[in-house]
Structure formats: C-alpha cells, structure tokens
Amino acid sequence: MEEKSDIAKKKGIVNEKDGSAMVHIPAGTFLMGNEKNSVNVEAFYIDKYPITNNQYKKFIDETNYAEPAFWKNVKFNNPEQPVVGVNWTDAVAYANWAGKRLPEEKEWEKASRGTDGREYPWGNVKPDQSLAVFDLEISKGAPTNVGTHLSGVSPFGCYDMSGNIWEWCQEWYTEGKYRVVRGGSWINHLNILSCSYRSCSVPAGKDNNVGFRCVKDSA
C-alpha cells in the first residue's frame, strides 16, 4: 500500500506472533482533546490497522478461545475485515497472546491525530466516504476491509482510526461500569469521527461495530 506520510516510513516493525505491521510513534508531546492540552507520551508501536478476522482466527486456533459474536455472519467475517463482536476482555486476551496490550487513550489519540491538533487523521476537512466509513444503514452496511481508505491515513501512517469500527482502549470511562472506545464506526454520524471524540461501552459488550488494535512499548 502506498504511504501518505514520510513519517510512517521512518520506523516500523512486524509483530512476530500475529504478523501485524506496527508503526512507531515517537516520544513527545501532542495536542489532546477538544481543549488541545499539551500531553506527553512515551514512544510506542501501534498496529497500522485494526486486528482482522484472519489474525483473530490464528489466536482462536492456537488457544481454543471462544469465537466472537457475528463470526459466522457473512456481513462481518471476511478475513480482512476488522474483527468485531469482541468485548474488552476478549481484546485483552488477544493482546496478551500477541505480546502486546491495548492502547491508553493518549496513545490512541496521538497515533490518530499526530502532534498538530488536527480534527481528523487526514486534517481538518470534514469526512466523506473517500476518507472514512460512516453513516451506513444498520440493515445494509458493514465495516470495510482494513486499509481500504488510503486518503484517511493518519500523520504517523495508521489506517481506519476514524470510522469503520470503534476501538477498545485500556481505561475506564466510568470506573467499574464502562470502558473507553475511540474512533467512531460504520453506523455513526460524521460528528462522532473526530480524533478527540470519546465514547464508551460496557466491557462485556459484543457489538458489530466495536473491535480493537494493539500497542507495544518501544524498546
């Protein structure tokens, strides 16, 4: 795939366990949230794409872990679609198996937004269907294969961080009740797709618009 950002070419790894391409996010500050506060983040690697059904199948095959919801639904089980129907615990189990972890919110947002406080991964232009997957009918729509929207790439070279699927993060949104999800999804309105938008889901939820990507500490 053609990379839009020169930054993305500087450093990257392939995670041996699950074969995921990961991009390097350098240490330093970025502008976080609607208030654009300066927040420091240590260096880390993050999956270039959300975890796919194909990758999750390898995890299931090696561990006998339970299949996700929607696993046999043809709308959601293409090997290169992002895995959905996984709850927070499922995502953590996969991350542990792969030698990775779920991202902290600040890590996720920096990977999505870059350092300049932009509204969306690609800049400040409002989303359209060439940039992201959103606002589809529940009865007819579904997530696209990962990496389909090349123009929606983030400054660091991450794909699908706006729309397509929500992504689980480490933190509680409300302690003991909801976990943070980020990014918006294929069924959401464009107003929800900004890099700073925060939402949540019950940790046990297995929805057809929630998946995840992982991070790994930088050596």
Task: Tell where the protein language model's regions lie, with residue ranges.
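Non-catalytic surface loops within mature trypsin-like serine protease
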Residues: 27, 43, 52, 124, ...
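Pro/Ala/Gly-rich low-complexity, hydrophilic intrinsically disordered segments
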Residues: 1-7
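A short glycine-rich, aromatic-capped structural motif
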Residues: 14-68, 85-89, 162-163
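Functional-site microenvironments in short loops/helix caps that host divalent-cation chemistry
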Residues: 31, 66, 72-208
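Short, P/G- and charge-enriched loop/turn segments at secondary-structure junctions
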Residues: 9-13, 34-36, 198-203
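Short, structured beta-strand segments at or near domain termini in extracellular proteins/domains
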Residues: 208-219
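Conserved beta-strand and immediately adjacent loop positions that scaffold enzyme active sites
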Residues: 21, 155, 211
